[in-house]
């Protein structure tokens, strides 16, 4: 492995917790999943870290010893964007160089040795910004790969750096989408490409065999991966290198109105046009199953393809069901554990091809479950991981799994687990490595259940540093988005409960009606009920905390939320619960009911409110924070955040709310980021976001006076416009 020194990444936890400040949270190292080598001895992972001193991000790749938990740096070259192990060779790596000496905007593929990373050679030059590489090594020693890039309709890869800037900035559309998430649609789209690195004779290295092939463009209107969140999990390469499977939304349906997606199968060489195994004309399509399909994964023998699919064609939070397709079969594709009341989101086959390991939300966690590949629909899977949230998992030679995950108290946790033994050994955890996270641990978090509107409801409770149950701490009441989402035992760099708590709060983060991971009925009950049962659940949560948690000061509490959580904060402002908080924070939330028609994904609103804007208008207005009877109750100081590139909920929603608050004389502030979307991800912007959010709530909760180290609005580092 060379002369590099292995460093211990598992150290004794600090005896005293250190406050999680916004600066620490944002600048803490962010590590990727750990990918093991074929022998299971070491794993490779990437790290990136932002410096507020240098105002830039650095990145590097490391190796993790899977026996000792020690690590060493493999390369500090920030242009290396991906690294893959080649075949069954423990010593050879393929890496992607994000720069291209020959083609600006392209990438290069390099082959190198673990022991001498810098002595590799260039195997291929690719003409665009390809990413998401997957490889298999054939019996002849060739490397077959797939990756994706932007594409023109004619199948040519799109390279932004080689495109001449148009003379006009006009955009013209004859159909929707016009814009999606944070981008206006153009004539280019994502596509999966295939290629082969040919093994040379007489120890000659690998070279690209011809040009890469676009596997998606022959299917009119197809796109894979599907933006904005699609990636390498939207496609797969069979272990024998013969087949490629990819997901695409239904080409024949308006994409803004339907969630329907198909899984396509195509030869790796593109010799035949891709066909949908579960499309409307496919003989094996399960009856009545028309929703989103995703996560195609080939079996080890390349004879079967597992995937997930929802039933409803307009519902993004429908229950995903596991299906296993036999390559070439015309029989109806069978479901596996089809009655399971959970919604799996990832799949891995066991090496023997007999069992499927799936990840799924489950009671505020993201857990792993083992399911026989031929299981009947009444099979009830059992989890074999417990706390935290699983991010990725890979099989080791002993058939255990190398798992990478997070938790509320750590942004990186690496351990081994198996269906038979559960969690076996923790190899590394960021809270025991990084100074920024030192002292965080499972004791920072607990959970409660309380009687909600119609069923028991779950909530997380997160404690401040040096928590003393004999003292009182103001309540920070956090409301999640979605609405079909959840507060999970996972790390977030945007809404981090521990960062709120360490200002001096006890955070309560409930999972009310509409939340995911607690059974499909709880998720579905929010339909046409946005301000009904969920609001009642939140009221009952506040009442439970007030009565049963004596260390929580509800008299000086605050409430904050984003997206649907932002809507709920706006709804709370105009209802009785709003009077129980000293301050409110609404991030990118809806305010004016009639403005919902401006969103990008129309199927979402039409499903949520049981019809179109014109046919079901009363439903859209049923829970309208901007209704006069609610506006007249506004009185709690409120921070409003809304960003220009949020095309899910247009910035006019935030401006409308701020106008009303100002006109009503309610203490209020408007925070806007012109370059951010529904989220705030730029580190410098994130720091300002945290300064404003925490400074706002600290001012009105009294934390600013009681905790000298707390964030204050006096810390504001950008000019504040005030004409008064």
UniProtKB/Swiss-Prot annotation:
Recorded GO CC terms: extracellular region
Active site per database record: 563, 646, 678
InterPro entries listed in its UniProt record: 6-blade_b-propeller_TolB-like, AB_hydrolase_fold, Peptidase_S9_cat
Domain of life assignment: Eukaryota
Localization annotation: Secreted
A matching Pfam family: Peptidase_S9
Secreted in keyword set: yes
UniProt-listed Enzyme Commission number(s): 3.4.14.-
Leader peptide range in chain numbering: 1-19
Record keywords, A-Z: Aminopeptidase, Glycoprotein, Hydrolase, Protease, Secreted, Serine protease, Signal
GO terms for biological process, alphabetical: proteolysis
Top EC class for this record: hydrolase
GO MF term set: aminopeptidase activity; serine-type endopeptidase activity
Protein task: Extracellular dipeptidyl-peptidase which removes N-terminal dipeptides sequentially from polypeptides having unsubstituted N-termini.
Protein name, entry field: Probable dipeptidyl-peptidase 5
Annotated organism of origin: Aspergillus clavatus (strain ATCC 1007 / CBS 513.65 / DSM 816 / NCTC 3887 / NRRL 1 / QM 1276 / 107)
Gene: dpp5
């Amino acid at each position: 492995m060379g002369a590099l020194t292995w460093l211990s990444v598992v150290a004794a936890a600090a005896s005293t917790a250190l406050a999680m400040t916004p600066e620490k949270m944002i600048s803490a190292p962010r590590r990727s999943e750990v990918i093991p080598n074929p022998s299971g001895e070491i794993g490779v992972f990437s790290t990136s870290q932002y410096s507020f001193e240098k105002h830039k991000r650095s990145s590097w790749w490391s190796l993790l010893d899977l026996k000792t938990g020690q690590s060493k740096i493999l390369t500090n070259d920030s242009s290396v964007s991906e690294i893959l192990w080649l075949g069954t060779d423990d010593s050879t790596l393929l890496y992607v160089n994000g720069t291209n000496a020959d083609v600006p905007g392209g990438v290069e593929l390099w082959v190198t040795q673990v022991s001498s990373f810098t002595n590799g050679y260039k195997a291929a030059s690719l003409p665009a910004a390809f990413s998401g590489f997957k490889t298999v090594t054939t019996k002849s020693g060739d490397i077959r790969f797939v990756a994706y890039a932007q594409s023109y309709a004619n199948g040519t890869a799109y390279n932004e750096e080689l495109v001449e800037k148009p003379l006009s900035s006009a955009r013209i559309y004859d159909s929707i989408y016009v814009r999606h998430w944070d981008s206006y649609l153009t004539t280019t789209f994502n596509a999966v490409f295939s290629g082969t690195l040919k093994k040379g004779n007489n120890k000659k290295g690998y070279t690209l065999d011809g040009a890469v092939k676009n596997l998606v463009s022959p299917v009119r209107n197809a796109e894979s991966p599907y933006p904005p969140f699609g990636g390498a999990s939207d496609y797969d390469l069979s272990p024998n290198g013969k087949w490629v499977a990819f997901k695409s939304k239904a080409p024949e349906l308006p994409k803004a109105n339907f969630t329907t997606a198909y899984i396509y199968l195509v030869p790796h060489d593109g010799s035949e046009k891709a066909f949908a195994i579960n499309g409307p004309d496919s003989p094996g399509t399960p009856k009545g199953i028309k929703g989103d399909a995703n996560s195609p994964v080939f079996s080890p023998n390349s004879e079967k393809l597992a995937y997930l699919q929802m039933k409803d064609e307009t519902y993004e939070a429908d229950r995903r069901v596991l299906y296993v397709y036999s390559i070439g079969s015309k029989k109806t594709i069978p479901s596996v554990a089809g009655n399971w009341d959970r919604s799996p989101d990832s799949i891995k086959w066991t090496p023997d091809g007999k069992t499927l390991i799936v990840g799924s939300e489950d009671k505020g966690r993201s857990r792993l479950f083992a399911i026989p590949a031929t299981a009947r629909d009444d099979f009830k899977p059992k989890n074999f991981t417990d706390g935290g949230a699983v991010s990725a998992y890979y099989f080791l030679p002993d058939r255990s799994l190398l798992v990478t995950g997070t938790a509320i108290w750590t942004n990186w946790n690496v351990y081994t687990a198996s269906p038979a033994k559960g969690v076996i050994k923790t190899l590394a955890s960021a809270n025991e490595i990084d100074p920024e996270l030192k002292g965080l641990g499972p004791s920072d978090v607990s959970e409660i259940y309380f009687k909600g509107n119609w069923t028991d409801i779950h909530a997380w409770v997160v404690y401040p540093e040096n928590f003393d149950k004999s003292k009182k701490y103001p309540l920070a009441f956090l409301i999640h988005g979605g609405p079909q989402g959840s507060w999970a035992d996972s790390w977030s760099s945007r809404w981090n409960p521990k960062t709120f708590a360490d200002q001096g709060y006890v955070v309560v983060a409930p999972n009310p009606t509409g939340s995911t991971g607690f059974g499909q009925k709880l998720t579905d009950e929010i339909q046409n009920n946005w301000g009904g049962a969920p609001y009642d659940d939140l009221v009952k949560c506040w009442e439970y905390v007030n009565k049963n948690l004596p260390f929580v000061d509800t008299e000086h509490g605050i409430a904050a939320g984003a997206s649907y959580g932002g809507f709920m904060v706006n709804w709370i402002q105009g209802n009785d619960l709003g009077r129980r908080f000293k301050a409110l924070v609404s991030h990118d939330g809806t305010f004016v009911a009639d403005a919902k028609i401006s969103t990008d994904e129309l199927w979402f609103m039409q499903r949520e409110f049981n019809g179109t804007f014109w046919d079901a208008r009363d439903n859209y207005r049923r829970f309208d924070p901007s209704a006069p009877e609610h506006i007249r109750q506004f009185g709690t100081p409120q921070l409003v955040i809304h960003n220009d590139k949020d095309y899910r909920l247009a910035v006019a929603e935030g401006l409308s709310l701020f106008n009303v608050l100002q006109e009503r004389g309610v203490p209020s502030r408007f925070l806007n980021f012109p370059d951010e979307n529904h989220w705030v991800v730029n580190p410098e912007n994130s720091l300002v976001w945290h300064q404003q959010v925490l400074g706002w709530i600290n001012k009105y909760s009294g934390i600013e006076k009681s905790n000298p180290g707390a964030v204050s609005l006096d810390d504001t580092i950008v000019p504040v416009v005030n004409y008064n």
